[in-house]
UniProtKB/Swiss-Prot annotation:
This is Peptidyl-prolyl cis-trans isomerase FKBP65. One of its GO terms (cellular component) is nucleus. GO terms for biological process: cellular heat acclimation. It catalyses: [protein]-peptidylproline (omega=180) = [protein]-peptidylproline (omega=0). Its EC number is 5.2.1.8. One of its GO terms (molecular function) is peptidyl-prolyl cis-trans isomerase activity. The gene is FKBP65. It comes from Arabidopsis thaliana. Residues 539-555 are annotated as: Calmodulin-binding. Belongs to the FKBP-type PPIase family.
Amino acid sequence: MEDDFDTQNQFPEEEPEEMDMDLPDNDEADSAPYLKIGEEMEIGKSGLKKKLVKECEKWDTPENGDEVEVHYTGTLLDGTKFDSSRDRGTPFKFTLGQGHVIKGWDLGIKTMKKGENAIFTIPPELAYGETGSPPTIPPNATLQFDVELIAWRSVKDICGDGGVSKKIIVEGEKWEKPKDLDEVYVKYEARLEDGTIVGKSDGVEFTVKEGHFCPALSKAVKTMKRGEKVLLTVKPQYGFGEFGRPASDGLQAAIPPNATLQIDLELVSWKTVVEVTDDRKVIKKILKEGEGYERPNEGAIVKLKLIGKLQDGTTVFVKKGHEEDEEPFEFKIDEEQVIEGLEKAVMGMKKGEVALITISPEYAFGSSESKQELAVIPPNSTVYYEVELVSFIKEKESWDMNTQERIEAAGKKKEEGNVLFKAGKYARASKRYERGVKYIEYDSTFDEEEKKKSKDLKIACNLNDAACKLKLKDYKEAAKLSTKVLEMDSRNVKAMYRRAHAYLETADLDLAELDIKKALEIDPDNKEVKIEYKKLKEKVKEYNKKDAKFYSNMLSKMLEPHKGTQKEAQAMSIDTKA
């Protein structure tokens, strides 16, 4: 029944570590409004609203320049969730009033107290405006954020313990700041408190995480913008500690034990390094920033210039789009026309961006030898691509479609999923079904006939996706998808069958039995369900045997001490008589 298909994702949301909207300098809200729980009021004169969910007894609120730490969930007005730090399990940190986030956040969060929870309704003018933030936020969208202010601290105290103090001498540009994997280029001069120079560079490049000179440099550059110049006061624990550092061949003076340092530091530039996959096996280093904010989505047609090299850095195995009369290399995303790692990396690029992509074998050519046009790639090879994204044409988003187009797009994704499923490509098929559902997930604007078609497509896509999840051994997700179907069609035997199958695999035998019995009530002659019922009975017998053995062993162990005590008592009795 898993293969018995009804024949009637968009790119995952990026984690907005810092939301990219420039802010005006003027502030509309400088004080915290007094609210009772459940009350809502407007902040400023631009339509920003705040509703208090949980109050706090403290009175102080953060100021511009403070680093705040929040948990949040962002939704559209129709309830569609587009982002959540709570789902990721990691609070979001940013510097208040510096343009790191949309203006509605900067204005709203400065009215909050530590521990407070509030819901902000943010009009498009204070959010992402006329352009929106594709693919998750449509143009002219009013947003709602459920925000909890966890903590904040002054960015002047970088580490929170007084170990590194930062004084900004020259403000940097824009709002971006380097992260752990980025390669920064800095200039610095380090001095003892008496002015003795103990370290200097007119230009050095290093990875933030790996550091350079002393731990304070890595801590500091993560708080700096491009072009920013600062004076750091560095305590020993972030300098050279209790042992100091000896002089080096007359080139650098010694650093005494427990010395405090003064460091002039300039962040000249950096190359952004991105972990494309969660397992860090596809890494992208941006050599040249791209234009705008849009990136290719699944189904997009992209054009590239690329050079592929082996790990030795000299062996070129592919080169496309670089000759004067040569057209860029073209492929369609999610059609297996290139290796998985390259495809994933390109989906995170902007038009005109140039990047160096490092791809481990799992996302490249695997454990087999692969003959490419210019060289043979040995088994288990890590490969490197230098890629320029020349242009791309995105697949149409759902909000750019009318209702009929959305239904047709959903049907097309379902058919594509069916083809992939029959070819045994279950993960890719699952993505097609998920994308199909997204087109028609919200159908409030559909007429009655369109709603019926939409419902049938949602049932088919979720049902077939559940079959994919069973094949991929993702049994919990298979059960969830089957439940979605049953919420729309409570007598759907296939959904009961697939959920029962999932429950059997997760050892939820009581739940599996309920689904199987219900399915047989509706369709007593269904062979597949009968086979599943047989499997259930066998599993129940197996578990009963295990339980019987377990309790038998446990009972034996409980009785053993009593037997031993009895024997000892008998022995003592004999000894006494003797």
